[in-house]
Curated annotation (Swiss-Prot):
Disulphide bridges: none
Cellular component, GO annotation: cytosolic large ribosomal subunit
Role: This protein binds to the 23S rRNA, and is important in its secondary structure. It is located near the subunit interface in the base of the L7/L12 stalk, and near the tRNA binding site of the peptidyltransferase center.
Name listed for the protein in its UniProt record: Large ribosomal subunit protein uL6
InterPro entries named among the record's database cross-references: Ribosomal_uL6-like (IPR000702), Ribosomal_uL6-like_a/b-dom_sf (IPR036789), Ribosomal_uL6_a/b-dom (IPR020040), Ribosomal_uL6_bac-type (IPR019906), Ribosomal_uL6_CS (IPR002358)
Source organism of this protein record: Nocardia farcinica (strain IFM 10152)
MF terms (GO), sorted A to Z: rRNA binding; structural constituent of ribosome
Keyword Ribonucleoprotein assigned: yes
HAMAP family according to UniProt: Ribosomal_uL6_B
Membership in a protein family: Belongs to the universal ribosomal protein uL6 family.
Record carries keyword Ribosomal protein: yes
Domain of life: Bacteria
Length: 179
């Protein structure tokens, strides 16, 4: 049995869960998320209103989907109650970010500004020209848009310039030595 998969999922008060066949819908104070569960995995309401994820047998695919499904549903519940946020920082001379409505516009040393549109359900908050955050209720979307922004100008190993996640440690390389 998957150690993660066999743990029941606690449902906090204020969260409404609807199970319709293979579709699980989670509604909370911050919004609604839905997920389609892969075919052999079943989600049921157990005792004390907790959710239980079960698999029919121990085939390799079913074992891997078991823990994954449980974690995805737990992330949905946390998303609609607390939400997710990734803080990011910009290092480098002249590198900055500014809010343009609900979107962001980056100056990253290119000859043109780089715009980033906020997908549905994602909000950007600019704290300073070099610090901003990405937040939303869907953990996957928050991580995906953060990775796209990070990829616009990855941290340089020689000078450390670029966009980083808050707390990210950039391994620095030693430059060439002159004669």
């Amino acid at each position: 049995m998957s150690r993660i998969g066999k743990k029941p999922i606690a449902v906090p008060s204020g969260v409404e869960i609807t199970i319709d066949g293979q579709h699980v819908s989670v509604k909370g104070p911050k919004g609604t998320l839905t997920h389609t569960v892969a075919e052999p995995i079943t989600v049921t309401r157990g005792e004390d209103g907790q959710l239980e994820v079960t698999r029919p047998n121990d085939e390799r695919r079913n074992r891997s989907l078991h823990g994954l499904t449980r974690t995805l549903i737990a992330n949905m519940i946390e998303g609609v109650t607390k939400g997710y946020e990734k803080k990011m920082e910009i290092f480098g001379v002249g590198y900055r970010v500014q809010a343009k409505g609900s979107n962001l516009e980056f100056a990253l040393g290119y000859s043109h500004p780089v715009p980033v549109e906020a997908p549905e359900g994602i909000t950007f908050a600019v704290e300073s020209p070099t610090k901003f955050s990405v937040s939303g209720i869907d953990k996957q979307k928050v991580g995906q848009i953060s990775a796209v922004i990070h990829g616009l100008r990855k941290p340089d190993p020689y000078k450390g310039k670029g966009i980083r996640y808050a707390g990210e440690v950039v391994r620095r390389k030693v430059g060439k030595t002159g004669k």
